[in-house]
């Protein structure tokens, strides 16, 4: 049995949702209604993110990347969390609806451990930015994910594996439903409670590491 940890990036590893931060910096007025529609479930993540990046001219891509890399603040305890998982032989995958230009530099700078990264990229060859999804929804998903976290879980988890999901928002709900256990904050915490998913709340990765190291924690009742 392998324990597989599926960890979100925006608002989970990063203190802020970087896509929202980018939009409020580069296209604040036009993007805000889209942000709110996605959060309210009135617009799919895929459709909303594509529409938001299409607001930004391609000649601003360099500035967008530089802003995102400079503005990304990492939630406390993340490097120690990765180290703890590595020591236990747990496999960590960063599965993000975000983009390579800010996800990959942060992860590579913080950890030398073997961490798989699933994220997306931007095509700046046209007049405006275009989203290129690395893992679009498969036939088993009902669609609209953008990067499909359930697809990633189906591809990497083997029969008998245990899956832990870590996240903060509505984009993490489908993965949380597939997981054996969830570490949740913000909107995902509310939804985990409403759905009755086995979970623990967290604010920092120190909280998660403490639960992992406590063999008597609720987590282990769902990993046996």
How does the language model describe each region?
Residues 30-36, 61-65, 112-114:
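Short, surface-exposed acidic
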Residues 16-17, 43-50, 66-70, 153-158:
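Short acidic/polar alpha-helix capping motifs at helix-coil junctions
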Residues 77-83, 87-91, 98-224:
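C-terminal cap/substrate-recognition subdomain and adjoining C-terminal extension
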Residues 1-54:
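Active-site neighborhood of HAD-like aspartate-dependent phosphohydrolases
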Residues 47-80, 88-90:
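Metal-dependent phosphoesterase signature
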Residues 6-8, 95, 166:
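Short hydrophobic segments within beta-strands
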């Amino acid at each position: 049995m392998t324990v597989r940890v599926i960890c979100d990036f925006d608002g989970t590893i990063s203190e802020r949702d970087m896509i929202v931060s980018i939009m409020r910096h580069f296209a604040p007025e036009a993007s805000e209604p889209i942000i709110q529609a996605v959060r309210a479930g009135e617009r799919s993540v895929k459709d909303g993110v594509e529409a938001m990046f299409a607001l930004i001219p391609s000649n601003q891509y360099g500035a967008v990347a530089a802003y995102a890399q400079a503005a990304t603040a990492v939630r406390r305890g993340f490097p120690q969390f990765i180290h703890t998982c590595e020591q236990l032989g747990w496999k960590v995958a960063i599965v993000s609806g975000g983009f390579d230009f800010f996800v990959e530099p942060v992860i590579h700078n913080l950890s030398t451990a073997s961490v798989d990264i699933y994220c997306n990229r931007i095509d700046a060859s046209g007049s405006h930015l275009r989203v290129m999804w690395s893992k679009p929804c498969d036939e088993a998903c009902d669609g609209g994910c953008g990067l499909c976290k359930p697809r990633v879980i189906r591809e990497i988890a083997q029969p008998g594996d245990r899956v832990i999901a870590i996240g903060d928002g509505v984009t993490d709900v489908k993965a949380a439903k597939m997981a054996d256990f969830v570490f949740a904050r913000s909107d995902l915490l509310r939804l985990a409670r409403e759905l009755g998913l086995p979970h623990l709340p967290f604010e920092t990765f120190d909280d998660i590491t403490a639960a992992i190291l406590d063999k008597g924690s609720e987590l282990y009742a769902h990993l046996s």
